[in-house]
Amino acid sequence: MRGQQTPPQQPTRVRTPRENENEVLGVIEQMLGASRVRVRCMDGKLRMGRIPGKLKRKIWVREDDVVIVTPWEVQSDEKCDVIWRYTKGQVDWLNRKGYLDFMR
């Protein structure tokens, strides 16, 4: 069936932020270059996020992507590491479950 799009897959498991590991949901607001992004986090803070070297080629992020970040031990209000990016189906699931209410 050429030209027809397949319906989006329902995610079977969606990784949620682990509070005991200090993980926070965020949305990419701006690409800064040099593996840096500006992230609006669910705790209301605007942080500069870094994509670590081991994930640089695995995680391709764009503006408005929903990600999981871990704030740094030092300067935790200003800087963070991006550790996970959600797909479109996973973002829909997070919306339905109420995880993305901070974006409104």
Swiss-Prot record:
Species per Swiss-Prot/TrEMBL record: Methanococcus maripaludis (strain DSM 14266 / JCM 13030 / NBRC 101832 / S2 / LL)
Domain S1-like: 12-87
Function: Seems to be required for maximal rate of protein biosynthesis. Enhances ribosome dissociation into subunits and stabilizes the binding of the initiator Met-tRNA(I) to 40 S ribosomal subunits.
Alphabetical keyword list: Initiation factor, Protein biosynthesis
Region (Disordered): 1-20
NCBIfam families cross-referenced by the UniProt entry: eIF-1A, PRK04012.1-3, PRK04012.1-5
Compositional bias per record (Low complexity), positions renumbered to this chain: 1-14
Protein name, UniProt field: Translation initiation factor 1A
Molecular function, one GO term: RNA binding
Family statement: Belongs to the eIF-1A family.
Gene3D superfamilies: Nucleic acid-binding proteins
Top-level taxon of the source organism: Archaea
Pfam families linked to this entry: eIF-1a
